[in-house]
Amino acid sequence: MYVCLCNGISDKKIRQAVRQFSPHSFQQLKKFIPVGNQCGKCVRAAREVMEDELMQLPEFKESA
């Protein structure tokens, strides 16, 4: 599913970036992929996908 239509970023692309870079904030994620830097309508959905994927990572599961 496309999350950011302006830049053609899908939830899959966000999840891949989270697994690869383990960003600790949405601002960090934006350094790796161009999400939320145009109209901003995707920010909430992109953040939710990022947080969901972070919770799946082993290092975050242990600290939760």
Curated annotation (Swiss-Prot):
Keywords attached to this entry: 2Fe-2S, Electron transport, Iron, Iron-sulfur, Metal-binding, Transport
CDD domains cross-referenced by the UniProt entry: Fer2_BFD
Phenotype when changing residue 43 to I: In strain: ECOR 30
InterPro entries referenced in this protein's UniProt entry, alphabetically: BFD-associated_ferredoxin, BFD-like_2Fe2S-bd_dom, BFD-like_2Fe2S-bd_dom_sf
One Pfam match: Fer2_BFD
Stated role: Required for mobilization of iron from the bacterioferritin (BFR) complex.
Protein name from the UniProt record: Bacterioferritin-associated ferredoxin
Organism: Escherichia coli (strain K12)
Gene giving rise to this polypeptide: bfd
